[in-house]
Amino acid sequence: MTLGRFGLRRRSYDFPPFRPPSEANSLLLRVTRGCPWNRCSFCSMYKTVKFEIRDLEEIKSDIEMAKELYGDRVGTVFIGDSNSLIVKTEVLVQVLNSLYASFPHLERVTSYARAKTLAKKPLVDLEKIRQAGLTRLHVGLETGDRDLLKEIEKGATPEEMVEAGRKSKKAGFEYSLYVLLGIGGEEKWESHAKGTAEVLNQIDPHFIRVRTFIPQPNSPLYEAMEEGRFHMPSPETILKETKLLLEELHVNSQFLSDHISNLLPLHGKLPGDKEKMIQMIDEALRGLGEDDGLREEMEMRRKLTNL
């Protein structure tokens, strides 16, 4: 038998190509392939992947293979690809039932989800999925600014973002939202920060995870940058934007800068740690004016997108 990644049979186990950093130690289970939307102008993750929902028996076969390898040692599972909540509720419940039957010590099952899908899905369906054992949703907000959401072709309005978050929390999910620092470029950082804070304040998610935007080849925003239509924000602008975002937030969320490409390792519980994180940003802004080495380090970090 040919063994591939993690010792599983290379010819049949279907690994999700992406997962959140917080799921580094989780078993990866692919329920869908690609992205059903796949139009966001900043993203090239699934541009070459045709979206499809995997057959239930294929998924169960992967679960059985993982059980053969790991036995009862699996404690967390991440479901990929980009939006497993688009799967019919009864099918997703069967997948979750199979996971918990196979791994008796399973404590957490998480998944990417799209806000538009969550906003449309009936609350009763979300409650069934939560009761079956899906515990946390990772959702890309990117920005709460209405105009920017249109520009980056996110396919959801601020109101739909809020509806998705509130409904998911009501169903009992932990809700983890992702914000793209710098997605407004050099010119729109203030409206990006304020609009994003406004949406986050209405949702009050469990986790706010920030990522520094880096234009990806084969994406429309990369082409816009190459043609001079999008101006990458400076490290100072990214830091000022982050500071303004924190100042405008009135939530009870974990604020996490948990990716190596981010300029500062900001981690804290809001509101208690807000001033501590703002102080870190102020110190970094002062340092940029005094230390060329710090600027070089920050510029380098923005290029570390594949870790």
Regions found by a protein language model. Give the residues of each.
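Structural preference for beta-strand elements that scaffold enzyme active sites
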Residues: 28, 76-78, 108-110, 136-138, ...
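Catalytic cores of alpha/beta
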Residues: 124-126, 184-202
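Aromatic/hydrophobic pocket-lining residues that form the small-molecule binding cavity
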Residues: 59, 92, 122, 161, ...
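Auxiliary Fe-S-binding modules of radical SAM enzymes
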Residues: 1-23, 201-203, 207-307
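Conserved SAM/AdoMet-binding glycine-rich loop
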Residues: 67-170, 250
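Canonical Radical SAM [4Fe-4S] cluster-binding loop centered on the CxxxCxxC motif
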Residues: 15-61
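Conserved strand-turn element in the central/C-terminal portion of the radical SAM core barrel
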Residues: 116, 140, 144-148, 168-192, ...
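Conserved, mostly hydrophobic/aromatic
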Residues: 35, 43, 59, 79, ...
